[in-house]
Amino acid sequence: MLPALETTLPLLLFWGGIGYLLGSVPFGMVITRAFGLGNLREIGSGNIGTTNVLRTGSKAAAAATLLLDGGKGAAAVLLARALAGEDAAQLAGLLAFLGHCFPVWLGFKGGKGVATFLGLMLALAWPVGIACCLTWLGVAVLRRISSLAALCAAVAAPVWCLLLGAPQAAVLSALLALVILWRHRENIARLRAGTEPKIGQK
């Protein structure tokens, strides 16, 4: 189920653009440079997300990246919802997520979108967002593999939407889950081979 269309096309395009610009801010790279940790593209996997920031050895930098990457997804949703409507909020959230994954500033080579996904789900439907966060946390604690935790949280999101009374977010969450699965295709191959590194490993 999708939200009813209640916003004009020009406003939808505007909020989609705002969402994309918010999402495309590469906080992981900004923070690692601000902390004097070097160029994130030359560290670990070269990814701009929280897991790779953690490979610098700075838990503070990783926590800041997690909060800001999640925050930009939430901000896009909350701003669009407050000033336009639910349809604009979902579009802004989607574009914030895609902005993180494909930022124009980095030649469309960004992160895998997990923190931004969790942030925008918390803003769209907080019970679903909390359930997704707990899913991620549970798998991460039990298996110590960040990518597996992310995949489980993403795949569970549409189910949580239906179980927790947020069917209007189910289609969007399913679309985001598909993108996350695709962005993690190399991780999936390593998981199948048993070579995926655990959290904290470089």
Curated annotation (Swiss-Prot):
Any one GO molecular-function label of the UniProt entry: acyl-phosphate glycerol-3-phosphate acyltransferase activity
Key word Lipid biosynthesis present in the record? yes
| Membrane topology reported for the UniProt record | Multi-pass membrane protein
An example GO biological process term is: phospholipid biosynthetic process
Intracellular or extracellular location(s) = Cell inner membrane
Q: Which Pfam families match?
A: G3P_acyltransf
Q: What is its EC number?
A: 2.3.1.275
Q: In which pathway does it act?
A: Lipid metabolism; phospholipid metabolism
Name the keywords, alphabetized: Cell inner membrane, Cell membrane, Lipid biosynthesis, Lipid metabolism, Membrane, Phospholipid biosynthesis, Phospholipid metabolism, Plasmid, Transferase, Transmembrane, Transmembrane helix
Cellular component per GO, a single term: plasma membrane
Q: Does the keyword Lyase apply?
A: no
Q: List the catalytic activities from the record.
A: an acyl phosphate + sn-glycerol 3-phosphate = a 1-acyl-sn-glycero-3-phosphate + phosphate
Q: Predominant location of this chain?
A: membrane
The role this protein plays is: Catalyzes the transfer of an acyl group from acyl-phosphate (acyl-PO(4)) to glycerol-3-phosphate (G3P) to form lysophosphatidic acid (LPA). This enzyme utilizes acyl-phosphate as fatty acyl donor, but not acyl-CoA or acyl-ACP.
Spell out the subunit comment. Answer: Probably interacts with PlsX.
Describe the family membership recorded for this protein in Swiss-Prot or TrEMBL.
Answer: Belongs to the PlsY family.
What is the protein's given name? Glycerol-3-phosphate acyltransferase
Organism annotation: Ruegeria sp. (strain TM1040) (Silicibacter sp.)
Source gene?
Answer: plsY
